[in-house]
Design a protein with these regions (language model features):
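Short basic helix-loop element that most often maps to the first helix and adjoining turn
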Residues: 4-24
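Short, charged recognition helix plus adjacent turn
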Residues: 9-10, 14-15, 60-75
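A structural preference for long, well-packed, hydrophobic secondary-structure segments
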Residues: 14, 32-35, 56, 72
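Residue at a beta-strand N-cap/secondary-structure junction
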Residues: 15, 41-44
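Helix-turn-helix DNA-binding elements, focusing on the entry/boundary residues of the two helices
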Residues: 18, 29, 47
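Recognition helix of helix-turn-helix/homeodomain-like DNA-binding domains
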Residues: 27-42
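DNA major-groove recognition helix of helix-turn-helix
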Residues: 36, 46, 65
Length: 75
C-alpha cells in the first residue's frame, strides 16, 4: 500500500502537482489520485516515474510504496 500522506507531502515539498505527475505517468489526474489514495492499483513503472520526479531514492522506496495496513491488531 502507498503511504498516501507521505507521498502527498513529498509532492508539495518538491513543488509538484498531481496534474504534472499524471502527465509524466501517462494518466489523468483523477486516475493518479485514485492510485495514490490506494483506490486503484499502481504498477511498478508508474511508481518508478513518480520516484524519479520526486527525487525518491531507492532506499526510500519502501517508505512510500510498501506500507502495510494494520487494522484490528492486538499485541
Amino acid at each position: 500500500m502507498i503511504d498516501t500522506l507521505k507521498l502527498k507531502g513529498r509532492i508539495v515539498e518538491k513543488n509538484k502537482t498531481i496534474q504534472k505527475l499524471a502527465f509524466k505517468v501517462g494518466c489523468t489526474p483523477y486516475t493518479l489520485g485514485q492510485k495514490i489514495a490506494n483506490e486503484a492499483p499502481m504498477d511498478i513503472e508508474e511508481a518508478m516515474i513518480i520516484c524519479q520526479e520526486l527525487d525518491i531514492k531507492d532506499e526510500e522506496f519502501a517508505n512510500f510504496f510498501l506500507q502495510r495496513k494494520l487494522q484490528n491488531t492486538t499485541l
